[in-house]
């Protein structure tokens, strides 16, 4: 980690049925940039819908932000109507171009591209098994393990490499075998995973049984070559894995080709908004959605045990996203309201640490009756990828990223709301920043409970020994950061704000769903 925050591993997107699929993936990835800033990539099938004959998948990926990796020329070369895209922040696997996604597996006459958000807990075991069977790897990423496992299962199912996209009955049989390979793989991998997978003529989304990482489905009006969407009728029937071999159409939107809507699968609803799409629903935990030119199919490969990462609502997700029916902005606002009720203090102004602390600060101000002021400005041009080689330089980065508005703070008793305290280094620098701006008192309030345990399911976290709340009591932390008072929201209060208790709370209580 290069600063005192948790980082999500990745953002994923898949587009099906749009002439400019790569460009739409670019827009969607830009909306998901907050989920990963180390690398970006897009894969596209050039003729996947109109004709699978001779179709191929092209790939462009590199280190850096979306806007740095892709030029207009890149996007023009990525021509096609099926696409997957990825932004990455590493947890499993190093920060190298070899681990950038999408991963592509090419055969004689066919290819598979895969994007993954999350982290497997059994990837080392699976990798060893695959290597014993002759598989080779080009990266240290657990995501490549998923891709190689799908290929292995496809071959074991009788699928023919190089012929899944030829016409006739054999092609349909191979498509069924490939979907079954994805179902089998999803049942073998353990941990957190939200996947976007594509072949030359198919897009697949997969969400793990606990739904730890978010994944949602939307539609983009226009379809191929601007065709208007057909009126589809949704069937409520959902096929099991055993029934899949008999019929690939589970919950489907029956449409008459070629009049169909373009579809998008993405980590957050903000990506659907970025391509002017319409949100349809979240994928359920343990669900696979298959998109072909015939429409949508849904396969329930495992029973849902909903445990969405609670930190999506605290910090990771964009405030304009809605995850599993809960508005991120509203959740943060309600956390602030509860925090004000639980930890009131006399003060003159309330401020929020940009960006994820602002929603909670607004809620705190409303509930407490204390005025909200801006107080802190964030430098928008400092990326999260800045690597400071020493701890002292990392701590000093807060003065580059943030600056105080003296007229808002001078002579005031200030309540500052942040989303979390991880190591405590950023919090200490924030208090120094506010006092330097003339704040008479600084009362630190945190809209999440104390982070006491590391995450093993797709978040870049320090070791337990580096987490200040695991080694210090509340008063000790207050002294360490230099605040006049310090309080965290309770876990009970946080769940009250969210209106549910269907979350992974491992970083707070050490209890993990996997």
Language-model features: locations:
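PRPP-dependent phosphoribosyltransferase catalytic core
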Residues: 201-202, 276-282, 301-303, 432-514
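Serine residues within intrinsically disordered or low-complexity segments
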Residues: 51-52, 163, 228, 235, ...
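Conserved short alpha-helical segments that host acidic/polar catalytic motifs at enzyme active sites
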Residues: 1-222, 258-284, 290-347, 353, ...
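A conserved beta-strand->alpha-helix junction
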Residues: 70, 139, 144-149, 372-383, ...
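Intrinsic, low-complexity polybasic segments
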Residues: 159-165, 223-230, 235-242
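Secondary-structure transition/capping motifs at alpha-helix termini
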Residues: 135, 156, 344-348, 366-373, ...
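Short, glycine/charge-rich flexible loops or terminal/linker lids adjacent to PRPP-binding catalytic cores
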Residues: 369-415, 425, 452-460
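Extended, hydrophobic alpha-helical segments in both membrane/secreted and soluble proteins
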Residues: 350, 357-364, 368, 372, ...
């Amino acid at each position: 980690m290069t600063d005192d925050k948790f980082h999500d591993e990745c953002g994923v997107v898949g587009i099906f049925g749009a002439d400019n699929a790569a460009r739409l993936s670019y827009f969607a990835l830009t909306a998901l940039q907050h989920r990963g800033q180390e690398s970006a990539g897009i894969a596209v099938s050039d003729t996947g819908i109109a004709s699978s004959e001779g179709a191929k998948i092209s790939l462009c990926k590199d280190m850096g932000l979306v806007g740095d990796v892709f030029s207009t020329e890149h996007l023009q070369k990525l021509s096609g109507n099926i696409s997957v895209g990825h932004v990455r922040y590493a947890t499993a696997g190093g920060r190298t171009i070899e681990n950038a996604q999408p991963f592509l597996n090419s055969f004689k006459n066919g290819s598979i591209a895969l994007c993954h958000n999350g982290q497997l807990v059994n990837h080392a075991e699976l990798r060893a098994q695959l290597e014993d069977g002759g598989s080779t790897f080009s990266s240290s990423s657990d995501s490549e393990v998923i891709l190689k496992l799908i290929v292995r299962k496809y071959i074991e199912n009788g699928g023919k490499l190089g012929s899944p996209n030829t016409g006739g009955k054999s092609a349909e049989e191979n498509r069924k075998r490939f979907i079954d390979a994805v179902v089998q793989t999803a049942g073998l991998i353990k941990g957190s995973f939200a996947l976007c997978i594509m072949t030359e003529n198919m897009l697949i989304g997969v969400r793990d049984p606990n739904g730890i990482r978010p994944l949602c489905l939307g539609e983009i009006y226009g379809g191929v070559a601007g065709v208007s969407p057909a009126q589809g009728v949704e069937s409520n029937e959902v096929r099991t894995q055993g029934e899949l071999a008999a019929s690939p159409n589970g919950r489907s939107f029956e449409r008459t080709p070629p009049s169909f809507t373009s579809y998008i699968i993405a980590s957050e609803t903000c990506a659907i908004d970025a391509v002017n799409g319409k949100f349809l629903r979240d994928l359920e935990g343990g669900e696979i959605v298959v998109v072909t030119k015939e429409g949508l199919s849904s396969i329930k490969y495992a029973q849902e045990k909903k445990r969405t990462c609670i930190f999506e609502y605290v910090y990771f997700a964009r405030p304009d996203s809605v995850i599993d029916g809960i508005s991120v902005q509203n959740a943060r606002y309600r956390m602030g309201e509860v925090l004000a009720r639980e930890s009131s203090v006399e003060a003159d102004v309330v401020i929020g640490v940009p960006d994820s602390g602002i929603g909670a600060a607004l809620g705190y101000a409303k509930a407490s009756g204390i005025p909200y002021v801006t107080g802190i400005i964030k430098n928008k041009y400092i990326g999260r990828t800045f690597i400071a080689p020493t701890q002292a330089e990392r701590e000093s980065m807060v003065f580059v990223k943030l600056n105080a508005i003296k007229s808002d703070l001078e002579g005031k008793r200030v309540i500052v709301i942040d989303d979390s305290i991880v190591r405590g280094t950023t919090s200490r620098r924030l208090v120094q920043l506010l006092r330097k701006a003339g704040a008479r008192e600084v009362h630190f309030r945190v809209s999440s409970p104390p982070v006491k345990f590391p995450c093993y399911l797709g978040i870049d976290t320090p070791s337990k020994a580096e987490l200040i709340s695991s080694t210090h009591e509340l008063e000790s932390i207050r002294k360490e950061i230099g605040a006049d008072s310090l309080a965290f929201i309770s876990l009970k209060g946080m769940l009250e704000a969210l209106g549910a208790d269907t979350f992974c709370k491992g970083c707070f209580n050490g209890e993990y769903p996997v």
